[in-house]
């Protein structure tokens, strides 16, 4: 069935490779970010990540350490309408579940006079784990369209051949051609895991009483695994009918064998591939302080990151499917660059040591960060983020804060795929801090993200020649707690 094979080759390649790319930004490293969002003008320990130049203005000489633990859950769903789906409204809901139950991060800084040396370890990117246990619409739609189109063409070819045309009068043959989705089962599952571990080291120097600078770097290590399978099996009634027809009409046996192989399968793909890679991100920053104002900026250079396959399983039956797994052969490298990033923040302390607020802007140059199959070129622009937050010290013991973030990814239909899709969003975070003593602070925060549904329609849905529509939706919830130490 050449058309089915061609469709599945393209579908499997697109779907599997999309798991290896995508927008992997992760800025919620410290609980202070969760509860305020805009931390780009911070002069506390979380500034190691958000505003490293600002560490020169910390209020404590000596060591400051911070340990943070977060727990995140996401849903990533696709509501798909396609003409060949057997449901009454031809619509199916495909649910994806992503989780990162424990997200740790560790901060450290040592300040002495005008110098501050700092370090950070955490998950700086990646989407955690995501499971599509009920499969994906791109698989189901493409397989259904391929099987229907191929068997419809077979019926037409038989009708034009006087030697076999009478066979079409047999109800068993007439009921089999063309094959509709109620005659076979598609069993598919996709699972992915992506984590980018970051280890950052750097130094801050106070040039003037109102100005400091930072230089450092972050070592990034990518760890991922992508596994999935697609199995197409005839229903028992169809399998029995195929056998009966083959016995009744031996001349049709070779043709029928293209529908169902000797193992009773119509298709079988199985993949288990781990990927690793690393790259170094140079980082510079500056912080200016004047009469209650703080103006800070940070720039992270683009990181070239190539990830290499360690493939344990790559089964494709029939053999024509092997090309679909070419990108996942053992030892193959795939680009997955981290984009250059620019942060700018303006903070103001309305009441000294009491009430402060910050507005902030982030830009991720995603269009120039190479992804698998040049996927970045499909973006309309890089990612823009605007943040704002306010923090109030109720007294010397208790602090409360809240903040918002709006994210615009510059998405396009060509960029989105079922396993790697993004949705523009806004986030709201809130929480507080408790000074357990002069040298120990407890932070607690919670934030949720509201995503805008993304609709895409195609007249030629993933090469099926039939129209289809997807609505992508996501949810995100994160809770965390952390503790800061000074000594």
Tell where the protein language model's regions lie, with residue ranges.
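Repeated loop/turn-to-beta-strand initiation elements of outer-membrane beta-barrel proteins
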Residues: 114-117, 210-213, 292-295, 353-357, ...
């Amino acid at each position: 069935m050449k058309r089915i094979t061609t469709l599945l080759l393209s579908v499997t390649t697109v779907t599997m490779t999309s798991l290896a790319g995508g927008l992997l930004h992760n800025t919620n490293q410290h609980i202070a970010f969760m509860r305020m969002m805009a931390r780009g003008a911070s002069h506390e320990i979380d500034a190691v990540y958000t505003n490293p130049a600002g560490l020169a203005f910390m209020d404590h000489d000596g060591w400051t350490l911070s340990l943070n633990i977060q727990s995140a859950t996401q849903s990533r769903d696709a509501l798909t309408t396609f003409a060949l789906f057997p449901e009454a409204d031809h619509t199916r809901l495909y649910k994806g579940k992503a989780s990162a139950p424990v997200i740790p991060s560790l901060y450290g800084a040592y300040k002495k006079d005008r110098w501050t040396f700092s370090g950070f370890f955490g998950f700086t990117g990646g989407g955690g784990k995501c499971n599509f246990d009920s499969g994906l619409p791109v698989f189901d739609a493409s397989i259904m369209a391929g099987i229907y189109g191929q068997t419809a063409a077979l019926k037409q070819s038989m009708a034009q051949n006087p030697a076999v045309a009478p066979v079409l009068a047999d109800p068993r043959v007439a009921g089999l051609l063309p094959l509709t989705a109620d005659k076979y089962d598609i069993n598919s599952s996709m699972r992915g895991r992506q984590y980018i571990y970051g280890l950052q080291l750097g130094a801050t120097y106070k040039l003037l009483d109102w100005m400091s600078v930072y230089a450092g770097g972050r070592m990034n290590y990518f760890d991922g695994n992508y596994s999935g399978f697609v199995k197409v099996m005839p229903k028992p009634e169809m399998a029995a009918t195929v056998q009966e027809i083959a016995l009744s009409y031996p001349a049709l046996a070779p043709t029928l064998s293209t529908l169902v192989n000797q193992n009773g399968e119509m298709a079988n793909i199985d993949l288990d591939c781990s990927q690793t890679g690393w790259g170094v991100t140079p980082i510079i920053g500056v912080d200016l302080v004047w009469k209650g104002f703080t103006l800070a900026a940070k720039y992270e250079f683009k990181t070239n990151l190539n990830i290499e396959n360690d493939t344990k399983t790559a089964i494709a039956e029939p053999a024509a499917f092997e090309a679909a797994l070419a990108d996942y052969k053992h030892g193959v490298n795939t680009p997955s660059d981290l984009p250059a990033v620019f942060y700018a923040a303006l903070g103001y302390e309305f009441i000294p040591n009491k009430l402060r607020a910050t507005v902030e802007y982030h830009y991720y140059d995603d269009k120039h960060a190479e992804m698998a199959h040049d996927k970045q070129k499909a973006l309309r622009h890089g990612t823009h983020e605007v943040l704002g937050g306010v923090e109030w010290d109720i007294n010397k013991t208790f602090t409360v804060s809240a903040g918002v973030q709006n994210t615009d990814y510059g998405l396009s239909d060509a960029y989105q795929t079922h396993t790697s899709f993004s949705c523009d969003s806004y986030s709201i975070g809130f929480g507080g801090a408790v000074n357990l003593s002069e040298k120990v602070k407890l932070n607690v925060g919670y934030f949720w993200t509201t995503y805008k549904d993304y609709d895409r329609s195609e007249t030629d849905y993933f090469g099926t020649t039939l129209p289809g529509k997807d609505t992508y939706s996501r949810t995100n919830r994160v809770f965390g707690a952390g503790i800061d130490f000074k000594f």
